Regions:
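Phosphate-binding glycine-rich loops and their immediate beta-loop-alpha structural context
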Residues: 1-70
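Solvent-exposed alpha-helices and their adjacent loops that cap or buttress functional pockets
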Residues: 2-5, 61-62, 93-94, 102-105, ...
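Structural motif
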Residues: 7-10, 65-67, 108-112, 174-175, ...
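Glycine-rich phosphate-binding loop
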Residues: 58-103, 114
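Anionic-ligand-binding alpha/beta catalytic cores of soluble enzymes and soluble regulatory domains
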Residues: 78, 96, 101-147
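C-terminal terminal segments
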Residues: 142-210
Length: 210
């Protein structure tokens, strides 16, 4: 059986995305390229201001298999009112990416990513990649290497919850970057792997090829 490509709609939110600002919706650009590189379709990739009515209209009008809304997952007055949605997932025990949310309506998936670039990057490389892997190959998870925590030099005790950490892997060792703050965009630029810590003695290492 030949599978049809998944169809995505990307909605970036934020009133900072205007012609008068130098801020660009790079999360949406990255996700758009990631989806296409994995041989699926982006039907629409739009950027809208912080407007609840406009966002609801775009969500309700979506005919794509998967709609990803980026930004507006915080608790300020301009952020999304999630009482309008019947959420299946309302946050993750995870850093970065804790504000992630999801609901399903009429067999279509709607996901909310935080606007923070590091969070969006991790969720794209783990959740979107996992969905594509399940759809393409009927596999329940993406490939990873299992690493003993004692073989990696990093103070994992400082982590308060399950975490994806940016790192660099070469032939000899695995280096976890010291500054794992979600505002540190250098991690995205220099990392070639994500290391998942789930409070056990085994780490999962996911290679980043994008």
């Amino acid at each position: 059986k030949i599978l049809q490509p998944l169809k995505f709609k990307i909605i970036s939110t934020g009133s900072e995305f205007t012609k008068d600002h130098f801020i660009l919706p790079t999360n949406g650009y990255y996700l758009n390229n990631f989806i296409k590189k994995n041989n699926h379709i982006v039907e629409k990739n739009i950027h809208i201001k912080d407007d609840q009515k406009l966002l609801l209209k775009e969500i309700n009008n979506s005919k794509s298999d998967i709609t990803v809304i980026i930004g507006g997952t915080g608790k300020s007055k301009d952020d999304i009112n999630f009482e309008n949605f019947n959420l299946i997932i309302d946050g993750l025990d995870l850093k970065p990416g804790r504000p992630f949310k999801l609901f399903i309506k009429k067999n279509k998936i709607y996901m909310f990513f935080p606007g923070n670039p590091c969070s969006s990057f991790v969720l794209t490389n783990i959740i979107i990649k996992s969905l594509i892997e399940i759809y393409n190959n009927r596999k329940s998870q993406i490939k990873y290497d299992l690493i003993d925590i004692n073989n990696v030099k990093f103070n994992f005790k400082i982590l308060k919850r399950k975490s994806f950490l940016f790192g660099l892997r070469d032939q000899k060792s695995i280096k976890v970057f010291n500054n794992q703050e979600s505002s540190n965009l250098k991690n995205i630029l220099y990392a070639n792997c994500l290391i998942y810590y789930d409070r056990t003695n085994k780490l999962r290492l996911y290679q980043i090829n994008d």
